[in-house]
């Protein structure tokens, strides 16, 4: 049994997660989170909010998971959101074609369907299931289609990402931020992709959770005011050049920007914050790297893009976060289709005076002549360059109708004007987090086995703030004189907002092992000494050491242990084993 099987078996058995619809045989690409998994997921999301909503001051919004067709036409999902697919001609099994050549090409995403099929043929790749011949590769759109209302007049789609809701709400968000850049919006929620062959547990799902931030910035200024906070962080970077050599480089964030490895300070800042967040939820630093997209795999509109990748036992390096400079693509795409103005007026620090040549129509003549059409005609004339004002007459087209205007009715003057700012279409920096993938990574990176007393102890070494249970309250025996004081301690933890578990079933050793397996950092045992002197034992999950503390101080001590304000060995009197 490899580590992936060990983790997924533990997750099912202990109530973290399991395949959906088990009663009816299940469906690939869907997973349910059990009691412990739902708690773990919520804590991962809450720490994300602590970083990006509280730490960065970004506004959290919530948008529908169904979108109208126009949204995805503008975003490009209708025409370009697809994966390459191939089908076995014998058994009819369907595969994602680029996954079949991963052992040949490190990043097959950049290849066209034709190139992938050629590699399949050249390398004699056959159906993994039956060895049959594979069909030609074709593109399969990954969006789930539905209808909004009865009939098919108003098609809709389950959103493939949370990001579009933030772009659609740009004008309202801009107003919320008092018409000034930069600002950010975040959303945590469900997204949907009709994956071709989801076979990797929660790593590849058809319904999954995302946490995304869209940071709207002035395209002329890509420096970050808080860059000094992260510039000395050392990251393991797998840049395009490093990928050519096949060797990860470790360097500071500041050096990466100075050398032009990461495009600019703002992008580097969010790469660094992503690193800090992933460590805060329990991702192993030694199994974490940031890989830069190669030029041929990066979206044509992107300026730079980095993926946070983690090393998993069975699956190798897997992307769990993407951090991209998407330039102004998203807002310009929605501007083009919606005709809405998604630009921002950015004030200069000081007004500047500029001279320019202005075209001035003679409205005393044009007004009476064209009446209601005069303003539109004048606007069209003013938009013309001086070079276009040649000849005795000027031809212009307004609303599909052509007009001839005498040249003498248009004058050209040099004017000086005060310019207080200019309109810009913001660029977008997008850190996009796959919550389900992060959760599985935390499970696998926290999983440890060690021999203890002729048996193998399994322990999930969650960080204290991540564990789905903060503390377990365990009466030494299921007897009233021990259960009642234990229950009072349990109730006090609950009143203080801490997640406590009360357990009387089985021997105390068995209960310790059970809490090791689910990652509970501390177990409090109420024994007969408690009845004599009011003290209880506290057991540390990772070291299995025990101390005695006063029962009345249990909540404060556990809280300080979890926050790191108190060291376990100094929190009470050691218990001799």
Curated annotation (Swiss-Prot):
Organism: Methanothrix thermoacetophila (strain DSM 6194 / JCM 14653 / NBRC 101360 / PT) (Methanosaeta thermophila)
Summary of the function given for this chain in its UniProt record: Catalyzes the attachment of glycine to tRNA(Gly).
Taxon lineage: Archaea, Methanobacteriati, Methanobacteriota, Stenosarchaea group, Methanomicrobia
Superkingdom of this protein's organism: Archaea
Residues annotated for substrate binding in this entry: 96, 161, 208-212, 430-434
Chain ranges passing through the membrane: none
Key words of the record: Aminoacyl-tRNA synthetase, ATP-binding, Cytoplasm, Ligase, Nucleotide-binding, Protein biosynthesis
Catalysed conversion reaction: tRNA(Gly) + glycine + ATP = glycyl-tRNA(Gly) + AMP + diphosphate
Stored Pfam families: HGTP_anticodon, tRNA-synt_2b
Protein name listed in UniProt: Glycine--tRNA ligase
Main location: cytoplasm
């Amino acid at each position: 049994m490899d580590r992936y099987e060990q983790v997924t078996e533990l997750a099912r058995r202990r109530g973290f997660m399991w395949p959906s619809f088990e009663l009816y045989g299940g469906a690939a690409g869907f997973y349910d989170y059990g009691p412990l998994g739902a708690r773990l997921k919520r804590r991962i999301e809450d720490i994300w909010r602590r970083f990006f909503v509280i730490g960065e001051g970004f506004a959290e919004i919530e948008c529908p998971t169904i979108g109208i067709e126009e949204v995805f036409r503008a975003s490009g999902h209708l025409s370009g959101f697809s994966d390459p697919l191939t089908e076995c001609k014998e058994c009819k099994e369907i595969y994602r074609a680029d996954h079949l050549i991963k052992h040949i090409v490190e990043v097959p995403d950049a290849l066209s369907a034709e190139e992938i099929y050629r590699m399949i043929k050249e390398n004699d790749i056959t159906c993994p299931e039956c060895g049959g011949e594979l069909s030609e590769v074709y593109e399969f759109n990954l969006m789930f289609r539905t209808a909004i209302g009865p009939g098919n007049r108003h098609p809709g789609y389950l959103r493939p990402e949370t990001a579009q809701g933030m772009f659609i709400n740009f004008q309202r968000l801009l107003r919320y931020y008092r018409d000034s850049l930069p600002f950010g919006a975040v959303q945590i929620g469900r997204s949907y992709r009709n994956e071709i062959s989801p076979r990797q547990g929660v790593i590849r799902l058809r319904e999954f959770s995302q946490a995304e931030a869209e940071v709207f910035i002035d395209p002329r200024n890509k420096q970050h005011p808080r860059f000094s906070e992260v510039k000395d962080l050392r990251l393991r970077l797998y840049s395009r050049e490093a990928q050519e050599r096949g060797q990860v480089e470790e360097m500071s964030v500041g050096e990466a920007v100075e050398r032009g490895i990461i495009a600019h300070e703002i992008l580097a800042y969010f790469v660094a914050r992503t690193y800090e967040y992933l460590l805060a939820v329990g991702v192993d630093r030694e199994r974490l790297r940031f890989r830069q997209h190669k030029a041929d795999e990066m979206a044509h509109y992107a300026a730079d893009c980095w993926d946070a990748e983690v090393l998993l036992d069975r699956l190798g390096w897997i992307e769990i976060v993407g951090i991209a400079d998407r330039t102004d693509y998203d807002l310009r795409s929605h501007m083009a289709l919606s005709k809405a103005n998604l630009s921002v007026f950015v004030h200069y620090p000081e007004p500047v005076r500029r001279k320019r040549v202005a075209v001035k129509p003679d409205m005393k003549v044009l007004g009476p002549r064209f009446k209601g059409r005069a303003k539109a005609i004048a606007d069209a004339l003013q938009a013309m360059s001086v070079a276009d004002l040649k000849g005795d007459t000027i031809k212009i087209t307004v609303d599909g109708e052509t007009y001839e205007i005498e040249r003498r009715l248009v004058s050209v003057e040099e004017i000086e004007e005060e310019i207080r700012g200019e309109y810009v279409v913001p660029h977008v920096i997008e850190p996009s987090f796959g919550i389900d993938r992060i959760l599985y990574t935390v499970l696998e990176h926290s999983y440890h086995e060690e021999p203890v007393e002729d048996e193998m102890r399994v322990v999930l070494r969650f960080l204290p703030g991540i564990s789905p249970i903060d503390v377990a309250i365990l009466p030494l025996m299921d007897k009233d004189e021990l259960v009642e004081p234990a229950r009072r301690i349990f109730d006090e933890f609950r009143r203080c907002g801490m997640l406590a578990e009360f357990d009387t079933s089985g021997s105390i050793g068995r209960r310790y092992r059970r809490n090791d397996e689910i990652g509970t950092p501390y177990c409090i045992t109420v024994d007969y000494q408690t009845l004599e002197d009011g003290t209880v034992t506290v057991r540390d999950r990772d070291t299995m050491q025990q101390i005695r503390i006063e029962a009345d101080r249990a909540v404060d001590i556990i809280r300080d242990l979890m926050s790191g304000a108190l060291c376990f060995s100094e929190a009470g009197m050691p218990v001799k084993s």
